[in-house]
Each structure stands twice: as C-alpha cells, then as structure tokens.
Amino acid sequence: MRMKQGVSRRRMLALSAAAGSLAICREAAAQAEKRIERLDPALDAIISTSEPIVDLATNLGGTANVEGPLWWSEGGYLLFRGTDLARWKYVPGQGISVFKQNTNAANGITRDPQGRLVACEAATRRVTREERDGSITVLASSFQGRRLNFPNDIVVKSDGAIYFTDPWTGPAAVQPPGENDQIFAGVYRISPDLGTLTLLVNDFLVPNGIAFSPDERVLYINDTARRHIRAFDVAPNGTLARQTDRVFADLSGPEPGAPDGMKVDSAGNVFCGGAGGIYILDPKGKKLGRIVHGYQNTSNIAFAGDDWKTVYFCTRTSLGTFKVKIAGVPVPAVKKS
C-alpha cells in the first residue's frame, strides 16, 4: 500500500511537471507569435522592438468584434464595445466590467471638445451624443431623406465638427436598399453648429477607420475592401479638397487582416491594422514597422494613459496593449490656434 501511494505521488508530481512544461511551451509558442518588426530604422524613435505585447483579455466569445476603444482620461479607464455589443470598461490593474448594457450596438466612439461622448450607433443607424444627464441627442440619422447605412467610425475636429464613415455593410447590406436607404457608402461631416450634414466623398467600397493628422490639415480614411488608406487635405471650410485625394498606404498582404480603426500620434505617425498586424506609418505613408500580435485582425486602436503613450488594440475576441515612446493625439481634441 505504501509503495502504491509512493508511486501515485511520483506519478502526480510527474504529471504536474509535464502539465506545467506543456503550459510553458504553449505560452512560449504564443509569445513567439508576438513580435515587433522593424521595417525602417526610424521605428526606434517610436517603439522598441523588445517592447512586450501584452494580452489583457482573450477568447472573449460572443458574436461581435471587440471594437471602439476610447480612453476616458478623467476616470483612468478604457471604454470599448464588447462581444455582446454592450459597452465594457477596462481599468488597468483591475480588469473588465460591463459599463453600459444598451448602447444600440455603438461601434466607433469619441468625445467632442466639451468632453461629451459621441457614438456611431449601428443598430439605429445614427450618430448620437450623450449629454451630461445621460440623455441622448441625435446628431445625424439620414441624408437627403434616406437613412444612413451603418455609421462605423468617427473623429471630432477641435472646432467641434464631426466626421464619420458610413459603410454599406451591417443591417443595410442584409437586403437590397429600399426607397429610404442610401445607395452608396459615404463619409460625412456634421458642422460645428450641428446644423448641416455634408457628404464629403462617396466612392469608397467600405469606408472604415478615420483620423486627423495632429495639425488637422489632413484627414485619413481607410477602405477595408481595397486594403488601403486614403488621405485628403482639409479645405478651410472643413470639407475635403478632392483634388488632393491620394492613396496614403497599401496595407494588403498574404496574411489575414485589413485596415479598420486607426489612430495618429503627436508626431503624425499613423497606426492602423493591416495584413499580419498593426502597421506604423510615417506622415508620408512609409511603413516603419509592424506589431505582430498573433491574431487574425485588428479591429481598432486607442492611445491612452496619463501620458498618452499606452496603446490598446482590439481584435475579434481580445484586448491587448503595448507602450510607445511618442504620445498619441489626446481625446478630446484641443482647439488649434
């Protein structure tokens, strides 16, 4: 009996050691998939190739992509859309909790110059603003008598003008457009006084991520279907100088992943998902590096932290982070002089 007990203990120890070794091997394999690729020496001023890429939450399940991250600087937490379409909150060092259950499947969110939350609501096909008392103000729901398609991502200029993408996807793509639906995918501007909705461009296949250069003179918009980012100079009246339309960067490749949400740092470098990970591009569109996080897609990105040098990224079912050396453009945007 003693011998059997002794063998049992040894076997348990051996199995425990084997399980531990297997876990370590799996973790090492997963970490081996994560790397920072230097495509140009200029990357070193932005991020170290030895910078850890950290998973904060994985295998979140659900039917929707993890999306729409936004750092709430006053509270020191990250808001983002969870896989159940609710708005979740991540507090560094504490974890994830549900922040708001019913958001009408809001995707891209940001803040206006007064600090109020502005959202693209997919389920209701509108752009809204949440007031201080929690009430909702509808900022845009139709254009020229036809409903918006599927407001997706959004950015607010420092003068209060709101720019958003409206791809022909989601609920609007389930069936052919009716007489009250748009017949194109558009990019729009809501005037600072909220009185005018202007169609800026309508020749994208799937307009998605949208971001300004730090001086707000250039607007970047990516086209997920074409796998590239386009850039436009911003005219004095806030519309786009169409003659300046150019392909800023092609992010296609053999690996999974396409341009989706994107953000810009204070030096003008663009962070955007693409084939194989997150690309870092200089202000001229040159590829400086790629963050390979080991997931098939990057749905969105946000700068965060007290110094805006923490980057959070969302994938299909995960949330991750890494640090950079150059601060991102703060949200809300600061009025340009």
How does the language model describe each region?
Residues 232-240, 324-329:
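Short loop/turn segments immediately following beta-strands, especially the blade-tip
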